[in-house]
Amino acid sequence: MFSPVPPCIREQIMKRIPPFDGIRWVAFTHFHEDHFDLDLVNRYLQEAAPEMLVMPEDTQYGVSSKLKAGVCSTEAIELPMGQCRSIRLWETGSLTAFPSRHAGREYEKVSHLCYVLEADGKKVLILGDSDYDSVFFKQMAGAMEFDAVIANPLFLHLPRGRRVFAQSIRTKEIIFCHLPFAEDDQIHFRNMMSEDMKQYCHP
């Protein structure tokens, strides 16, 4: 259903070839295989030696015990719903994590984090595979306005997802991710997204 990172780009990341040469921090929203590959992450930690890895605390998959972090600092975050934790990255940059439910009742026990990246006066909200809960995001976002939100296409396709942006999250831009490449798109996700953008996205 979803596309893996193409091998050529994956190798550029591993070998820190520009534009992937300045990565100092790595963060994961959750550990589903379309977001996280333990072998590739361990290889990257060994070869690129980033400063910090941020991820949910996890008991379902036991990821922490399988990581080969080396000199990389590991922040495994476990918080009650509704709370957040901020990590200072540099003088004008921080990463704030807060737990959210994963979309889909079958995934309700999956450890999942959203992130707010603040850098040089800009704020970006990363939703991962969050549930489409406008009440929850109104509580977490408060009066904040984001410069961009990174969301999966179902936030546009589903009425519940659209309500999150209509009622709860204020943002200048929405960046949609998690789209398969054309050759992998067996369920016509790209066509769905194209039609949704025509219908719901207006200048």
Predicted regions and their residues:
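Active-site-proximal loop/helix segments of hydrolase catalytic cores
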Residues: 39, 101-168
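Active-site environment of divalent metal-dependent phosphoester hydrolases
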Residues: 31-38, 59-63, 85-88, 105, ...
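Active-site HxH/HxHxD metal-binding segment of metal-dependent hydrolases
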Residues: 13-85
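Structured loop/turn residues at beta-strand edges in well-structured enzyme cores
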Residues: 21, 48, 93, 144, ...
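Pre-active-site segment of Zn-dependent metallo-hydrolases
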Residues: 1-27, 39-43, 105, 131-144
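Binuclear metal-ion centers of metallo-dependent hydrolases, dominated by the metallo-beta-lactamase
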Residues: 52, 67-91, 138-140, 163-203
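Active-site neighborhood of phospho(di)ester-bond hydrolases with catalytic His/Asp-centered motifs
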Residues: 1, 22-34, 54-57, 125-130, ...
